[in-house]
């Protein structure tokens, strides 16, 4: 009798503030979990919004951790090991130009709320270039059957909710207003590293494994 193979670990390459920084702490508290320490965090109390409603609304980004995806979660192709992934990330990070991000704005992106770079800001070009490089250079390491597709039109975003239809319209409005106020004090962020996250089993919480600094 054969033993079924365990599902492969999936990885995500993303932007994320450095753990311990104010930018990381702010996002982790909003979501209710620190993906670096793998510990829950107390969420914001929003007047008029039940705690369980906010917890439900933030469930999806809480599982993924505080990250802006550059390459969608992927499993390693057969024969590719962790060392090869680390080497590829080092090469990739050293090929990218760091940039300062402007103050991020709360916007609706599809059916979620997220922090985004203003559409007219030049940083979007650098972020789009980095995302394209991630997809191109890591494609050879990825198992096509273990990948999730990202939208063809990339837009940098840090998700702060899951699907808005999980709560009613008045709650959506209260959460939007609270997010605008909460993140208005977010310190300026720099895109100067690639963050590597891992999902150890299907449906498990993602963990932040590493930050690979850009060399320039």
What is the meaning of each model-derived region?
Residues 75, 116-123:
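Short histidine-centered catalytic/ligand-binding loop motif
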Residues 1-109, 125-185, 201-216:
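Basic, often amphipathic N-terminal segments
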């Amino acid at each position: 009798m054969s033993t079924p193979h365990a599902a492969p670990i999936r990885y995500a390459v993303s932007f994320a503030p450095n753990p311990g920084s104010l930018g990381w702490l702010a996002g982790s508290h909003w979501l209710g979990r620190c993906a670096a320490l793998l510990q829950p965090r107390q969420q914001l109390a929003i007047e008029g919004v039940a705690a369980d409603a906010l917890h439900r609304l933030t469930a999806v980004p809480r599982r993924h951790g505080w990250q802006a995806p550059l390459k969608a979660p992927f499993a390693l192709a057969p024969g590719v090991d962790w060392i090869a992934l680390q080497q590829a990330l080092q090469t990739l990070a050293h090929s990218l130009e760091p940039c300062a991000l402007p103050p991020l704005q709360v916007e609706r992106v599809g059916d979620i709320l997220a922090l985004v770079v203003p559409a007219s800001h030049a940083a979007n070009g650098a972020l789009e270039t980095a995302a394209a490089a991630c997809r191109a250079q890591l494609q050879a390491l990825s198992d096509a059957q273990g990948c999730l597709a990202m939208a063809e039109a990339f837009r940098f975003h840090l998700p702060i909710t899951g699907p808005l239809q999980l709560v009613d319209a008045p709650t959506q409005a209260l959460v939007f207003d609270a997010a605008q106020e909460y993140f208005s004090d977010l310190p300026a962020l720099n895109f100067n590293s690639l963050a590597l996250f891992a999902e150890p089993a299907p449906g498990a919480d993602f963990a932040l494994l590493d930050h690979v600094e850009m060399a320039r």
